[in-house]
């Protein structure tokens, strides 16, 4: 994956890469992520992986806002290619807007590689619990492009801050989401119940 990640980085030299992934459907909030790109400087590029019914609408939005050089719809990204995108990105963004997004496992995939996350505070959803605000990333108001952009910049604006979020993301994954940790937690529950 490292070789493929380096190739991806070469495609976007001197850019901060924001990666997002999911079905192109309304509850994923990709229209707000595209809008957020308007508030980011030209040294950012947003890569959105996935297919779905909103593909043409999102492409029209990108073109209408003149963001073709800043936002790329990747289409289907095969599972074997995902590690390269997670390795290559500087940050992962989960812009979902409805509690249909119950957890957002893609956040955990990003954190396992030490990538900070920008996610949304969806009421009655586990998304903002998975991404600890101020530790592994930032959680923002759903449907708010400006807050998405501000959080992306806040995390990546200087190396010291960025490294702290990278370390926090990896630590959050280690403390809560490794397979061993989850098995230990389940066994602990069984022991209490029995």
Regions found by a protein language model. Give the residues of each.
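A short, well-ordered alpha-helix in the C-terminal region of glycosyltransferases
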Residues: 70, 147, 154, 161-176, ...
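Conserved donor-binding/catalytic core segment of Leloir-type glycosyltransferases
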Residues: 7-37, 47
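Conserved acidic donor-binding segment of nucleotide-sugar-dependent glycosyltransferases
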Residues: 132-145, 153-160
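Short alpha-helical segment that forms part of, or immediately flanks, the ligand-binding pocket
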Residues: 83, 101, 105-112, 128-129, ...
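Acidic donor-binding loop of glycosyltransferase active sites
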Residues: 87-102, 115
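Nucleotide-activated donor-binding/catalytic signature segment of Leloir-type glycosyltransferases, i.e.
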Residues: 57-77
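Short hydrophobic beta-strand element within catalytic cores of glycosyltransferases
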Residues: 112, 116-121
């Amino acid at each position: 994956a490292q070789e493929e990640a380096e190739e991806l980085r070469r495609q976007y030299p001197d850019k901060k890469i924001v990666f997002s992934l999911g079905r192109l459907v309304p509850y994923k909030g990709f229209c707000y992520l595209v809008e957020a790109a308007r508030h980011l400087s030209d040294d950012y590029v947003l890569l959105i992986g996935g297919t779905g019914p909103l593909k043409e609408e999102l492409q029209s939005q990108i073109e209408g806002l003149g963001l073709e050089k800043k936002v790329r719809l990747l289409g289907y990204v095969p599972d074997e290619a995902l590690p390269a995108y997670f390795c290559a990105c500087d940050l992962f963004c989960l812009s979902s807007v409805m509690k249909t997004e119950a957890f957002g496992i893609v956040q955990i995939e990003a954190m396992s590689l030490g990538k900070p996350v920008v996610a949304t505070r969806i009421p009655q959803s586990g998304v903002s619990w998975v991404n600890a605000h101020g530790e592994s990333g930032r959680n923002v108001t759903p449907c708010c492009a400006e807050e998405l952009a501000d959080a992306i910049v806040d995390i990546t604006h200087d190396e010291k801050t960025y490294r702290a979020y990278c370390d926090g993301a990896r630590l959050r994954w280690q403390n809560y989401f490794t397979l061993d940790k989850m098995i230990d937690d389940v066994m602990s529950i069984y022991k209490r119940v029995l």
